[in-house]
A protein has these predicted regions:
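Class I S-adenosyl-L-methionine-dependent methyltransferase catalytic core
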Residues: 1-231
Length: 231
């Protein structure tokens, strides 16, 4: 991880624990793919106000949406896997949720372009090697390619920029990964992909008592809508 900038309103770093991560698994979820709820709360409380509109393009099991609703924000999200969409609709009826591919936000843009105050998400991760499953298909298709994955995350970010209000903020949780002896610098690579479409505002490290899985560094990438964002 090389990229550094000022931490802004989130503080210089955030602390959490592996136990908090495990405890934060949504009820009924079959895997740990969520952000730590306390970190999501911190982001939402610091970067939005009650009544603001929060969006998640990789909604998963709905941690961001559930926390946003609990904190008095309006919430919307999309998820590729229909069973997870049904799960969120049952669990968070106050949120707007639909089945969609984050690489094609056209229908969402037609509804919400320029109105989202805060985007909070964690994209599905990929390593540079030993990773045939394609993350942006819900890991359900093979033929994954790391460079294509980064390009497609850039496509997601470009559309997210169009969803943001003029003073809107995007926060993505991204981590470097050590797998099969190879470290994937996902933080730097994702930051580079997003900087083509948004203005980098801060990189906020998350300090764990014990990093989960095979992560070697974990951060929040904070971006603002660029002046050149398409309307």
């Amino acid at each position: 991880m090389q990229v550094m900038t000022t931490p802004g309103r989130l503080g210089p770093s955030l602390a959490t624990t592996l136990q908090a991560f495990h405890d934060g698994r949504p009820p009924g979820a079959d895997e740990d793919v969520h952000m730590v709820p306390a970190i999501v709360d911190h982001v939402i409380e610091r970067l939005s106000s009650p009544g603001d509109f929060v969006f998640d393009p990789f909604a998963g099991f709905g941690t961001t949406l559930q926390r946003a609703v609990r904190l008095g924000r309006r919430a919307a999200g999309i998820e590729l896997l229909p069973e997870r969409v049904e799960y969120m609709r049952r669990r968070i009826p106050e949120a707007w949720v639909t089945t969609a591919d984050a690489r094609d936000l056209g229908p969402v843009l037609r509804l919400f372009a320029g109105t989202v105050d805060l985007i909070v998400s964690s994209p599905p991760y990929m390593t540079m090697t030993h990773h045939d499953a394609d993350p942006l298909t819900g890991y359900e298709k093979s033929g994954g390619d790391y460079d294509r994955y980064l390009d497609e995350l850039g496509t997601v970010a470009e559309q997210c920029a169009q969803l943001l209000a003029p003073d809107g903020v995007l926060v993505w949780n991204v981590a470097d990964i050590l797998h099969e002896g190879v470290t994937t610098p996902l933080v730097d690579d994702v930051a580079t992909a997003l900087k083509a479409h948004l203005s980098l505002d801060a990189v906020v490290p998350i300090d764990w008592d014990q990093l989960p899985h095979d992560l070697t560094a974990d951060v929040l990438l904070v971006f603002r809508r660029s002046l050149h964002t398409k309307k």
